[in-house]
Every structure is written in structure tokens, then in C-alpha cells.
A protein has these predicted regions:
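Short, aromatic- and glycine-rich surface loops/edge beta-strands on solvent-exposed regions
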Residues: 329, 358-369, 469-488
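C-terminal capping alpha-helices of c-type cytochrome domains
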Residues: 63-95, 147-186, 190-192
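Central antiparallel beta-sheet cores of small beta-barrel/beta-sandwich binding domains
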Residues: 119, 184-278
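Gly/Gly-Pro-rich "capping" loops immediately C-terminal to redox-active cysteine motifs
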Residues: 30-61, 120-145
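Beta-strand/beta-sandwich contexts
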Residues: 293-328, 370-422
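Edge beta-strand at a domain terminus
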Residues: 187, 268-302, 497-506
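The canonical Cys-X-X-Cys-His
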Residues: 22-32, 74, 111-123, 167
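Immunoglobulin-like IPT/TIG beta-sandwich domains and homologous Ig-like subdomains
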Residues: 311-314, 318-369, 425-428, 434, ...
């Protein structure tokens, strides 16, 4: 089950969307007073993925059959008319972007135990309902999942009583279908995503890149076509194209082909600089955060790649902004521009030499009145490393259910006495794995669970199924310590994270 991301036909307008609800849904969800109003449906608001999952559940549980094109139009109509405002979805962007290796926390003392033990709490908090409808959702869970009250964190309490008397009022107060944010967003000027942008990020195993992105309208309701033309910082080209749909006025969902690889893209277009994630639909851990800067005429400096330059070395520095001019750019003490590799309105690619005796610390970039501070630093050593995620889950795989990789990145920090740490971005490290504990060592988890790429921090799990070479013929699960050690330093600097390699997950909705 997954949200189908593609251009919608022109028939996906509001009136025709309402007609589709009447056709496929109103047999059970009765029309109510007011235009475009139905029982239960009008008591809820959700993300595009949330509405798509609802339609899928109607098919699985009630036999509702909605053809693909009509399903796409239904999702578009429901997300546009009953979606979430940007500030409502903002706390859960990580879940929408399928950044799954994270630990949730909530401002309710028992919500984790009551609701977020079978699915993420974010799946709940990306919905808005009336208090009456939240109560109906609780009752649905008890009826549909009949062992719910006998499970751990339920059998030790009056689960249903607590859910109805405590959780439902909290959800009704804090996640109501009525909100000022939604009312304001419905009155906001529609977002126009067309134009030219600079997009940048760091592709796992490939490296940092910058690319020009052209977005133009395509045939269909809020449908767009995009092209990507860029380079990795080591000079390799990056080319691609894709199709996208804009839901709820800002929720960008695209199918991309980058260098021949099929990827999905999720962006929030409500921001001045849209941002989000690009990832592999079959291996969602294999993804990258990206930011887009729209083209403009005024001078601005918004970002640099990389963020840390080592003293005594030459490197390619990407400066991203608008109205950039290499001749007018000041790069800071101890830095010398050796060659301008590329110059565009929104991008400078510079070969920069760093003096071997340059003082470690921040460097400000300046051009006329535009300044970028505390985003670029010079360092002579790395004082501290920080791996993210610090806890991750990878999954063994087979042809029918592909493996889920363990993808790690590391940031370096320069720490001066009495000063705030200076973030250096990604720095060169060597990656390795070792047993997390004595049991993992005795079971040979390092041997059987998979392989860590020393250079990239990408862990590739082993194949699924029983392994006759293991104790009890068990599968290739493991409990591993992931270590990153800074390269080229006289004193070892490292950090550790934990990686659980486990079995496949068979039910993978877009919102876990």
C-alpha cells in the first residue's frame, strides 16, 4: 500500500472530487447538510498519505473497489479540502518523509503506552478529528483488534476507560478538526511551485551535490513536470526528471529518476526555501534531505557545501544563493580561490585552497550587502564526532521483500575552550561494525548480519530466511555497534551507534 505519485488528470477538480465521494463512499458515509459533507469523512482531516491509507482500508475491510485514476482523484480532493495546514504537519515531517530511525516523544504522559506501541504516534498526530470521531476511532480499535486490551501496556490498566476518558479528550482539545491554522491556510494565496531552483543535499554513498531544477506546469490538476541538471562536488554529473502533484496547496509528492534510479520526493512548498527528502521507495532508509532555493535577482548567500574546510587542503566549494559573482565574493581569511569552476546566478563552484596555518574557526562569506555567517568553518582537526541516527533498524531481505539498509552519517565538531562547538558538517571517517554486547559476540552477529561499507557508512543486510550455519538455524539478525573514526588524526576520535538487524516487515504503509 502506497500513495501513487503521478500527475492527475484535469478532471480532478473539486466538483468532480465530490462526485467521486458520492459514487464510492456515500453508500456508507451519508451526505449531510451543506455542500460536500458526509458522515465521518467531514469529521476528519489528514495528509495525502493518510487519505490514501483510508481508501486502502476501505478496500481491504469492506470490499470498496476504486480504480487507480479515481483513487488518485479522490486523494487529491480529500487532501485539498480536508488536509492539514503547514504548521499542523510541521511537527511530523520526519514521518511524512519516511525518516523512520528516530525515537518519538509526546507531551502526554501515557499516549506512548496507550497508542504509540503498535504504530507511530505521528500517525495519530497527522490527523484532525472531532472529539466524537476520536472516540469512534478508539471503539473501532477495540472491535477490530480484539487482543488489544490483553497486550503489554494494556492488560495492567483499564485501557478502554483510559482511552475514552483521558486520551480522547486530549486529542479532541489538541488535534481538533476545527483550527485557526486550517482556516488561515484555506484563505492563503496559493503556492506556485513553477520556476527555476537550486537544489542541494548529500546522497548516501555518492556525496554532496548541487543541481538546477526546472519546474513547469503539466497537464492535470496541480500537476508538474521537473528536470534536474547538476553535479556532485567531485565533478560527476547528476541528471534527472520527474512528475509531481501538489496536494493541499503545499504538499509536493514526486516520482523522480535521478541518474537512472527511481526515487520518491516529498517536499514542503509552504516555505520560502522548500525542503524535504528524496528516497528509494523499496529501501526508504536510502534517502537524503534536500533544500530548494528559488531563483531571484537580489543578491543573497544561503548555503555552502561542504561546511568544513581542512587547513592545508584544496577542495571544491559550492556557494549557493542568488545574484552571485565570483569576482565580488569575499571568502574569508586563510582561503584563496584558485579557480572558478562554474558560475551561475544561483551557484558558484570554486576550487579553494586553505592555508596550512589558517586559524580554525568560522569564516564569513560576503558579497555586497549579502553575508553568510556561521555556516563555513576552517579546522585543523576534528575534536568530536556525532553519528546519526544513534539507533537504527535494518532488515534482511529477499527478492519479494527487499532489504532495508542501515544508512549512517556523521558530523564533525571543533571544540574550543569556553566556546560553542563549531559544526563542520560531514567529515572523512572510516566506518566499522562490532558486536554490541557479549551475546552478539557469541552468536557471531558481525559475521552473519551483513556488511558495512568502510567509506560510506551504508550497511547492507544479509539475505532473509533460516541460516543453517547459525545456531538453531536462526536468521541473519544481529545487534551491532556501528563506529566512525576520523581519518588522518594523531589522536583517535570516534563515535558509536547501535544497529539492530532484524527480519522483514510485511506491512509497510506510507505512514507507519
Amino acid at each position: 500500500m502506497a500513495l501513487v505519485l503521478c500527475a492527475l488528470p484535469a478532471s480532478g477538480m473539486a466538483a468532480e472530487g465530490a462526485q467521486l465521494v458520492d459514487r464510492y463512499c456515500s453508500g456508507c458515509h451519508q451526505p449531510q447538510a451543506g455542500e460536500g459533507s458526509w458522515s465521518r469523512i467531514s469529521a476528519q482531516r489528514k495528509t495525502p498519505e493518510g487519505w490514501d491509507m483510508t481508501i486502502a482500508r476501505m478496500g481491504i475491510m469492506h470490499g470498496v473497489q476504486v480504480p487507480g485514476e479515481d483513487r488518485r482523484e479522490l486523494v487529491k480532493y480529500l487532501a485539498d479540502s480536508r488536509g492539514l495546514a503547514p504548521q499542523e504537519s510541521a511537527p511530523q515531517r520526519a514521518l511524512i518523509e519516511r525518516r523512520l530511525n528516530r525515537v518519538e516523544s509526546f507531551d502526554h504522559p501515557t499516549f506512548q503506552q496507550m497508542c504509540a506501541r503498535c504504530h507511530t504516534g505521528g500517525r495519530v498526530l497527522l490527523q484532525r478529528r472531532t472529539e466524537e470521531d476520536w472516540a469512534k476511532l478508539v471503539n473501532f480499535h477495540v472491535g477490530q483488534y480484539q487482543t488489544l486490551e490483553f497486550q503489554s501496556n494494556a492488560r495492567d490498566r483499564d485501557w478502554l476507560g483510559l482511552a475514552l476518558d483521558d486520551i480522547v479528550p486530549w486529542l479532541g482539545d489538541n488535534f481538533s478538526v476545527q483550527s485557526d491554522a486550517w482556516d488561515s491556510w484555506q484563505q492563503a494565496t496559493p503556492v506556485d511551485p513553477t520556476g527555476r531552483f537550486q537544489m542541494w543535499g548529500s546522497w548516501p554513498g555518492q556525496g554532496a551535490f548541487v543541481a538546477a531544477v526546472e519546474i513547469e506546469a503539466a497537464e492535470g490538476d496541480d500537476a508538474y513536470r521537473m528536470s534536474v541538471d547538476g553535479h556532485f562536488l567531485d565533478g560527476r554529473e547528476l541528471q534527472g526528471q520527474g512528475m509531481a502533484t501538489l496536494f493541499t496547496g503545499y504538499e509536493w509528492r514526486a516520482q523522480l529518476s535521478l541518474d537512472g534510479q527511481s526515487l520518491l520526493q516529498v517536499l514542503d512548498f509552504s516555505q520560502d526555501m522548500p525542503s524535504g527528502r528524496v528516497f528509494d521507495a523499496d529501501d526508504e532508509a536510502m534517502g537524503m534531505q534536500v533544500t530548494l532555493l528559488p531563483e531571484a535577482q537580489e543578491t543573497s548567500i544561503e548555503a555552502v557545501l561542504p561546511r568544513g574546510l581542512k587547513a592545508g587542503e584544496r577542495t571544491t566549494l559550492a556557494v549557493i544563493g542568488t545574484g552571485l559573482d565570483a569576482d565580488a565574493l569575499e571568502v574569508g581569511e586563510g582561503l584563496e580561490v584558485i579557480e572558478v569552476l562554474k558560475q551561475e546566478n544561483g551557484l558558484l563552484l570554486l576550487e579553494v585552497a586553505v592555508d596550512g596555518s589558517a586559524t580554525p574557526g568560522w569564516r564569513a562569506l560576503r558579497q555586497a550587502d549579502a553575508t553568510l555567517e556561521r555556516k563555513l568553518a576552517v579546522y585543523d582537526r576534528v575534536d568530536r564526532l556525532e553519528i546519526s541516527p544513534d539507533f537504527a533498524v535494518a532488515r534482511v531481505g529477499a527478492e519479494q521483500t527487499p532489504a532495508v539498509s542501515g544508512v549512517f552519517r556523521v558530523e564533525g565538531y571543533l571544540e574550543g575552550e569556553g566556546q560553542q562547538p563549531i559544526a563542520l558538517g560531514e567529515v572523512p571517517v572510516n566506518w566499522s561494525v562490532s558486536p554490541w554486547d557479549e551475546t552478539a559476540e557469541q552468536d557471531g552477529d558481525v559475521t552473519f548480519a551483513g556488511v558495512m561499507d568502510k567509506a560510506s557508512g551504508i550497511f547492507s543486510p544479509s539475505g532473509a530466511g533460516p541460516n543453517p550455519e547459525r545456531k538453531y538455524d536462526t536468521n541473519n539478525a544481529g545487534n551491532l555497534r556501528v563506529s566512525a573514526t576520523a581519518r588522518g588524526q594523531s589522536e583517535a576520535v570516534s563515535d558509536d551507534a547501535q544497529l539492530i538487524v532484524t527480519v522483514q516487515r510485511w506491512n509497510n504503509p506510507p505512514l507507519r
